[in-house]
A protein has these predicted regions:
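Cytosolic-side transmembrane-helix boundaries in multi-pass membrane proteins
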Residues: 2-62, 143-157, 161-165, 230, ...
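Alpha-helical transmembrane segments within multi-pass membrane transporters and channels
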Residues: 127-163, 172-215, 268, 272, ...
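Transmembrane alpha-helical segments in multi-pass inner-membrane proteins
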Residues: 193, 373-380, 384, 390-456
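Membrane-interfacial amphipathic/re-entrant helices at transmembrane-helix boundaries
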Residues: 24-91, 124-141, 168-181, 313-318
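Single transmembrane alpha-helix segments in multi-pass membrane proteins
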Residues: 61-67, 72-125, 143-156, 198-208, ...
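Inter-helical junctions in multi-pass inner-membrane proteins, predominant
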Residues: 67-79, 126-130, 172-177, 222-223, ...
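Transmembrane helix-bundle core of multi-pass membrane transporters
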Residues: 131-139, 179, 218-339, 396, ...
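Short cytoplasmic-facing helical segments at TM-TM junctions of multi-pass membrane proteins
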Residues: 344-369
Length: 477
């Protein structure tokens, strides 16, 4: 990298030289035309980002709106948000794994294990010895101890603390409480991620093999915990049930809008004008203002619509933004901050781009690799809470079936590369919206489950093809 051109002893400006990417000469503001041409050049070079998913989302909304009068009703929009939230959350965790070019096929059944332990603690009033039986109880406790030790070996401290907290909850029989149940689910998810990550990062088993084996194993654990044909209800706990079925008040809905839209505008505009003050290249101010304005207007419109009564029964009132919206927004904000604004996030991208170069740069590759699996399983546990809340119970097949495939599909469809090093957390949200709309729209058209799976599979195949072609074009350019 060349230094910024400075004034010599004669007072004359030094000639500009160096590569186009040198920060020293990267100090002019782009015009709108230049910004658009640069973006088009990136697209032609194979860097599509989330553009295909956004275009697909637009086409799907238009198509299903034309085919079904129910699709754009307030009740269906609210239901769509609640239906897709669980998959979106699990997909967010998987983005961290995919950024390293790895895969976690066990995230779905891992979420099922977390949900089943949460429900057992609630149903059995905290008496986990009675819930599990002697053998399973002690095996579960030993597993959590091992998970904490494995995380400690690589100094992943959340992976140490949370399993220990979960172990304490189980051993002393903490009385049932919705917040305790959710914390316990998170602890179980973290424990599972610690084992998965260690086997991949330190033992050296390929992630596909490890997570495929654990996908089967955790499915068996859920069946063992709940029993064949059994079901654990959680709808009687108001807090747990309202996670995916409750709504904010009208006042709190608008407060959420002000915080979310205002925070987004402040961050985007703050970064933009900071770059201008430092003389760095920035997008044209009008384009930035348009982008912020579109987000704010759409958010305000969505908030207004969701604060209207959407109940079909005239004797019932249902209004307010669903609780799942702030849950997803908080996770999206935290995850985006971690990936974009911390050294840990930069290390993830570095390892995903070139693990050997990252190792030579002093990055603890094994620690990074293990940590993303801890994150994926922990976030999958949060997704399990939302999904279980939506259906009101935990069944032996929880986390199985299409849960994992839809979550991976959401991340990939949204624009996260299967080859590592490229992706954003928002990809999971965009891709999750595509999958949720396909499932919801085809359901409204009374299509059978087979059609939903076929269409979703074809969309995922198309997204993976775009990713592969994008990578090939980028390598050729």
């Amino acid at each position: 990298m060349t230094d910024t051109p400075t004034t010599g002893t004669t007072g004359e400006k030094a000639p500009e030289s160096g590569a186009i990417s040198d920060f020293g000469i990267d100090t002019t503001s782009k015009s709108a035309g230049e910004a658009l041409r640069e973006y088009w050049a990136k697209v032609r070079g194979g860097d599509f980002g989330s553009l295909p998913a956004l275009l697909g989302l637009f086409v799907l909304v238009i198509f299903f709106s034309a085919q079904s009068e129910t699709f754009l009703t307030l009740g269906n929009i609210s239901n769509l948000l609640a239906q897709g939230a669980g998959i979106v959350i699990i997909a967010m965790g998987l983005v961290f794994v995919l950024l390293l070019g790895e895969i976690d096929l066990s995230a779905g059944t891992a979420s099922g294990v977390a949900a089943s332990v949460m429900a057992l603690h609630l149903v059995k009033s905290g008496n986990m010895l009675s819930a599990f039986g002697d053998g399973v109880f002690y095996i579960t406790c030993a597993f959590m101890v091992i998970a904490a030790v494995l995380s400690g070996l690589l100094r992943i401290w959340p992976g140490v603390v949370l399993p220990v907290v979960g172990l304490v909850i189980i051993l002393i029989g903490v009385p049932p409480n919705a917040w305790v149940e959710m914390l316990l689910a998170l602890c179980i998810g973290t424990s599972i991620g610690s084992l998965t990550g260690y086997l991949v990062a330190k033992v050296g088993i390929p992630s596909f093999v490890v997570t495929l084996a654990l996908f089967l194993a955790w499915g068996g654990v859920v069946l063992k915990y709940i029993g064949q044909g059994g079901t654990l209800p959680i709808r009687n706990d108001k807090v747990l049930f309202n996670v995916a079925n409750g709504n904010l008040s009208i006042l709190n809905s608008w407060i959420l809008f002000l915080l979310a839209a205002g925070g987004y505008a402040a961050v985007v505009l703050g970064r933009h004008f900071a770059r201008l003050r430092k003389g760095l290249v920035a997008q044209p101010t009008p384009l930035v203002l348009i982008k912020v304005g579109v987000v704010v207007v759409l958010s305000a419109a969505a908030t207004f619509l969701l604060t209207q009564n959407r109940a079909v029964n005239p004797t019932v009132t249902i209004l307010g933004v669903p609780y799942v919206v702030p849950i997803v927004l908080v996770l999206l904000t935290l995850g985006t901050f971690v990936l974009d604004r911390t050294s840990y996030g930069r290390h993830i991208y570095a390892v995903g781009g070139n693990a050997e170069a990252a190792r030579r740069a002093g990055i603890n590759v094994a620690q990074i690799r293990m940590s993303v699996f801890v994150i994926a399983s922990s976030v999958a546990a949060l997704g399990a809470i939302v999904y279980s809340s939506k259906v009101g119970s935990v069944a032996p097949d929880s986390g199985g079936g299409n849960t994992l495939l839809f979550a991976v599909g959401a991340a990939v469809i949204g624009g996260t590369s299967l080859f590592g090093g490229k992706g954003r957390l928002r990809d999971a949200v965009i891709g999750g919206a595509v999958i949720a709309i396909i499932s919801n729209g085809l359901g409204l058209l009374k299509q059978e489950a087979a059609v939903v799976s076929i269409v979703t599979g074809l969309v995922l195949l198309l997204a993976a093809s775009v990713d592969a072609l994008s990578r090939r074009r980028s390598a050729a350019s």
